[in-house]
C-alpha cells in the first residue's frame, strides 16, 4: 500500500500547489482562542516528565489535549523543527509509518500533507492537508511560536483511490513558548482534532493523547539535538 500510495503523491502535490498557493483559507479563530486560553485545562497525567492536560471544547464531543514541559532551550530552535515538514518522516519516530510532505511554501506559511495508517481492523486510514505558520494566530498573540489548522479537502480524492482514507478537516494546534525564569521556557503543544469516521470517542481521545505526547517528545528531542550540534 505504501508504494501504491507514493505513486500518486507527485500528481497530488502538483495539483495542490496550484490550488492552494493563491487561495485564502480562513483560520478557525474561535478554536484557536479556546486552545490559547489558560482556563479549564484539567491535568490528565502528571506522572512523567511531561504534563498532559485536557480541555472540553464547547459543542464538541472530543477533548483538546495539551502536553507541556519546562526546558532550557531557545524558542527559535523549537520553531525551526516544527516548521521542518520535509524532515518529519525522519525525526517524528514515534509516529510509526505516518507519511508527511511539504506541498507548498510561501513567505507567510507552509502547506503540508499527512497520511496516517490506522492499524485496526475495519477502520480506514486517515489523511489531511494543513497550513502551518511560524508565529502567533492573532496580533496580540505573543506566546504562540507556531500555529496550524487543517485545510478543506480539495484534491485529496487522488490519494483516496489508493488508500480509501478518511479525510480530516476539523482541527488546529498551537505551539506555546512562555518564559518562566532565566534560561527556562515552558513549551506546550495544544491541539484539537476530530479524526472522523466510526471510531468511538473514548478511543479517539486515547489516540489523540498518545499522538500529541509522542509528537511533542520527538520534536523536543530533535530540537535539543540541533541545539547541541550548534554549540
Q: Where in the sequence are the language-model features?
A:
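Eukaryotic helix-grip
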Residues: 22-231
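Sec-dependent signal peptide recognition
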Residues: 3-11
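Hydrophobic h-region of N-terminal signal peptides that target proteins for export
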Residues: 12-20
Amino acid at each position: 500500500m505504501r508504494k501504491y500510495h507514493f505513486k500518486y503523491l507527485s500528481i497530488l502535490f502538483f495539483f495542490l500547489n496550484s490550488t492552494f498557493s493563491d487561495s485564502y483559507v480562513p483560520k478557525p479563530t474561535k478554536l484557536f482562542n479556546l486552545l490559547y486560553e489558560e482556563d479549564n485545562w484539567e491535568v490528565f497525567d502528571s506522572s512523567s516528565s511531561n504534563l498532559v492536560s485536557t480541555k472540553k471544547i464547547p459543542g464538541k464531543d472530543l477533548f483538546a489535549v495539551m502536553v507541556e514541559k519546562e526546558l532550557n532551550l531557545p524558542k527559535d530552535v523549537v520553531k525551526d523543527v516544527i516548521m521542518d515538514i520535509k524532515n518529519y518522516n525522519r525525526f517524528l519516530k514515534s509516529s510509526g509509518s505516518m507519511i508527511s510532505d511539504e506541498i507548498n511554501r510561501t513567505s507567510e506559511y507552509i502547506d503540508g500533507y499527512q497520511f496516517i495508517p490506522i492499524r485496526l481492523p475495519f477502520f480506514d486510514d486517515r489523511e489531511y492537508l494543513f497550513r502551518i505558520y511560524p508565529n502567533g494566530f492573532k496580533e496580540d498573540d505573543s506566546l504562540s511560536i507556531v500555529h496550524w489548522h487543517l485545510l478543506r479537502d480539495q484534491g485529496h480524492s487522488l490519494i483516496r483511490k489508493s488508500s480509501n482514507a478518511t479525510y480530516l478537516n476539523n482541527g488546529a494546534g498551537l505551539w506555546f513558548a512562555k518564559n518562566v525564569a532565566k534560561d527556562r521556557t515552558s513549551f506546550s503543544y495544544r491541539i484539537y482534532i476530530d479524526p472522523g469516521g466510526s471510531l468511538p470517542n473514548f478511543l479517539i481521545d486515547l489516540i489523540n493523547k498518545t499522538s500529541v505526547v509522542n509528537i511533542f517528545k520527538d520534536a523536543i528531542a530533535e530540537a535539543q539535538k540541533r541545539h547541541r550540534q550548534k554549540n
